[in-house]
Amino acid sequence: MEKFELHILGCGSALPTTRHFATSQVVNLRDKLFMIDCGEGAQMQLRKSRLKFSRLNHIFISHLHGDHCFGLMGLISTFGLLGRTAELHIHSPKGLEELLTPMLNFFCHTLAYKVIFHEFDTRQTSVVYEDRSMTVTTIPLQHRIPCCGFLFAEKARPNHIIRDMVDFYKVPVYELNRIKNGSDYVTPEGEVIANTRLTRPSDPPRKYAYCSDTIFRPEIVKQLSGVDLLFHEATFAESELARAKETYHTTAAQAARIALEAGVRQLVIGHFSARYEDESILLKEASAVFPNTILAKENLCISL
């Protein structure tokens, strides 16, 4: 299967700690890089990951709290120092362009590349990015300010040609695209060769969903149905349920309930409160509900 990876750059929450960087991730699909949130220190973690800066052209910001976007200015500036010329696209809720433009004009007015902002409505489910390989769709969340998650969905690929069978039936090259897309082949003599004899199914398309920050929100279960990997914030343990509700965050057990009801393959929890020096209690509570749960940690790479 072709590369589809999630790199965790940071998994902490608002209060800085010596154990965790602020929230930031990178999705690597076939060596195209997509950043999700850009907390303080994201560019340092990006260097540690050994991912190529030049392959990062799109950044998706879930909401305008500092622990999810304070790293943007530093990253934009560093791109300039590295001689970047390719456009950088930043997808975010309304307001980020207004906030960053004065700083860009002051600190980064000599950039040799364009920073292009794309704003979306966090209340709507909408496709905010699409190419030949993938779509990125917003997931409406409920936080103290407008916020959404993101669903990265690989597009279905054509069937694989069985070379020996194609050669055996002497299928012309110009017929191969039709056959890949499901058509049968008719020989010059009129014999119909079933597509199933000439192809094998491609690998099933994969999906990754990112949900942070949000109060427990069962409404998202339908959109998350069957995803291969779900990152869901788990800021608090169940003992802090009242605090989670008050701050519009989620407990580890609640995140696991979302994963269970959505039928996801694997759950990774993160956005840990600074009060926890050991997140094992969060893993224990989540795993009791959804066993295939792991803790996010810096420099973790997960292959889908």
UniProtKB/Swiss-Prot annotation:
Its EC number is 3.1.26.11. Zinc phosphodiesterase, which displays some tRNA 3'-processing endonuclease activity. Probably involved in tRNA maturation, by removing a 3'-trailer from precursor tRNA. The keyword Nuclease applies. Its cofactor is Zn(2+). Pfam families: Lactamase_B_2. Transmembrane segments: none annotated. The active site is at 67 (proton acceptor). InterPro entries: Metallo-B-lactamas, RibonucZ/Hydroxyglut_hydro, RNase_Z/BN. SUPFAM superfamilies: Metallo-hydrolase/oxidoreductase. The gene is rnz. Belongs to the RNase Z family. Zn(2+) 2 binds at residues 67-68, 213, 271. Keywords: Endonuclease, Hydrolase, Metal-binding, Nuclease, tRNA processing, Zinc. This is Ribonuclease Z. It catalyses: Endonucleolytic cleavage of RNA, removing extra 3' nucleotides from tRNA precursor, generating 3' termini of tRNAs. A 3'-hydroxy group is left at the tRNA terminus and a 5'-phosphoryl group is left at the trailer molecule. It comes from Bacteroides fragilis (strain ATCC 25285 / DSM 2151 / CCUG 4856 / JCM 11019 / LMG 10263 / NCTC 9343 / Onslow / VPI 2553 / EN-2). It is an enzyme of class 3 (hydrolase). Homodimer.
